[in-house]
Amino acid sequence: MTQSPIQQQTIQLVATQIPKTEKLEEMLTPFALDETLIRHLTKEEDGPFVHFWTLEDIVILGMTDTKVPYLEQGLERLRANGFTPIVRQAGGLAVVSNEGILNISLLFKNKQMPTINEAYEWMQQFIQAAFPEAEALGGIQAFEVADSYCPGDYDLSIQKRKIAGIAQRRLKDVVCVSIYLSVYGDQNRRGIVVRDFYDNALQGEETKWHFPEVNADSMWNISDALGINLTIEDVQVRVLQALTKLGCTLEENETDFIHTPEFQKALERFVKRQ
């Protein structure tokens, strides 16, 4: 295991809070901002960045989800359940983003590129450091929770129930490791919403792609797991404290990336691909 690339670094903090909206451009802002930061890092000796972001009542589909045989019926079901579907330009499958879900992107430049697993392990250790109470429950474990939504090898779990999922995006010598963390809210309903999507989008048909048979009970919030009332702000503070324990200096990012031509180009690309 190599040393985390963010230790002893000056971390630039970015936050994007998108309230409930019907504007596609606003829904896609966090994704376009991550892409802008990635491309910025390919050109500049800058970062690392930590980007906190939230969205309200959105189901984020992966490209694979668009291959389902009855996509429109699945999308109609999401809308009937009060969620707006959008598609991210990456692998993985559907995840929910609503009140109580915090997304965190860690973006860094590293000429000696870590393996994919190393980058995932750094994020796991980072989250463990933010929630030391989990040690009394057996710690935060990484393994695939096959009947969760968007299952992956580095699902993070407490007592075998998933609390978070991790994804990666790489470009040249830049890595973006992103995590969605279920902090509070009705996690059971989130699971039911995704299960309903697949039930309506697949209608029992076999496909060459694998989609999960979602068991809503396979996931829970970290608040419920730890028996602590946590807000999104509480978790952000814990993450910042974990960074300082790694010897990091924290500073607010001063560049308004959202008003740069690079961001506008990224946003236009995301909008066109919907």
Model-flagged regions — what are they?
Residues 141-163, 260:
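Beta-rich nucleic-acid/ligand-interaction surfaces
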Residues 24, 111-118, 226-229:
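Flexible, glycine/proline-enriched loop segments at strand-loop-helix junctions
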Residues 130, 134-137, 173-274:
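Long, positively charged amphipathic alpha-helical accessory segments at protein N-termini or as interdomain linkers
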Residues 102-146:
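Contiguous, small/hydrophobic- and glycine-enriched helical/loop subdomains that border
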Residues 29, 33, 70, 115-126, ...:
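Short amphipathic alpha-helical segments
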Residues 113, 160-168:
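Acidic, His- and aromatic-enriched active-site or binding-groove loops in soluble protein domains
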Residues 1-113:
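N-terminal lobe of the biotin/lipoate ligase/transferase fold
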